[in-house]
Amino acid sequence: MTTIVKRALVAAGMVLAIGGAAQANEGGVSLHKQDWSWKGIFGRYDQPQLQRGFQVFHEVCSTCHGMKRVAYRNLSALGFSEDGIKELAAEKEFPAGPDDNGDMFTRPGTPADHIPSPFANDKAAAAANGGAAPPDLSLLAKARPGGPNYIYSLLEGYASDSPGEPAEWWVKQQQEKGLEVAFNEAKYFNDYFPGHAISMPPPLMDDLITYEDGTAATKDQMAQDVVAYLNWAAEPELDARKSLGLKVLLFLGVLTAMLLALKLAIWRDVKH
């Protein structure tokens, strides 16, 4: 059994080492690891940060991305009022019908509706974005290796605000390998995107929006806030799950102590 465990640990170490090396070879840089508020057994989401993150998504990201797995009514968990949620939902039009004449029509959104894509379909989305349809963001924080750290790094990883301008480290790397230094003039260079050529322009810049709570809207602040919101969208039950886990651990601890005390009481007068 000991030998099996040792072999498993060695294999796991090799996998991690290979994975790290592959990431370094492809990206040239490591992910920016952030101290997220929800990490650790006692970590929890920061509700004001989630509200700011939704504001970034709503005012910036939603022009290209949808969140089909998040209903407007779910935003009540972020502290939004019922009236505020109704107002947000009503900003969007949803297909409905047919009417009495058999014609389809549109209606204002309701809290039961899910946050839609701004495009009618994937082909329309791809046509409007250089051939690549922007992904739905509902589960992005769980779907990408590195999760929130990857998304944050991606948002911060643009080499230039202009397309066709690769990072200096990449140019040097190509030259050292004797390869042609050629980069797609229509793409933006990103340290963390696979292949480094991304169609999405840098989405964030300082003071792009005005936070409703008065927080300074720096690029870094907006990146952290929207990543927090995306992680909540992917794991909205995280706080409840951790609270339940702590209660279970507390219960098991008390139960163990009671059983131990009971055992000692039963066997106290028994001679061994």
UniProtKB/Swiss-Prot annotation:
Record has ATP-binding as a keyword: no
Membrane topology: Single-pass membrane protein
Keyword ATP-binding: no
Keywords: Cell membrane, Electron transport, Heme, Iron, Membrane, Metal-binding, Respiratory chain, Signal, Transmembrane, Transmembrane helix, Transport
Post-translational modification: Binds 1 heme c group covalently per subunit.
Signal peptide (residue range): 1-24
Cross-referenced PROSITE patterns: CYTC (PS51007)
Cited Gene3D superfamilies: Cytochrome c-like domain (1.10.760.10), Cytochrome c1, transmembrane anchor, C-terminal (1.20.5.100)
This protein's GO CC annotations: plasma membrane
Protein's job: Component of the ubiquinol-cytochrome c reductase complex (complex III or cytochrome b-c1 complex), which is a respiratory chain that generates an electrochemical potential coupled to ATP synthesis.
The protein's name: Cytochrome c1
Source organism: Rhodospirillum rubrum
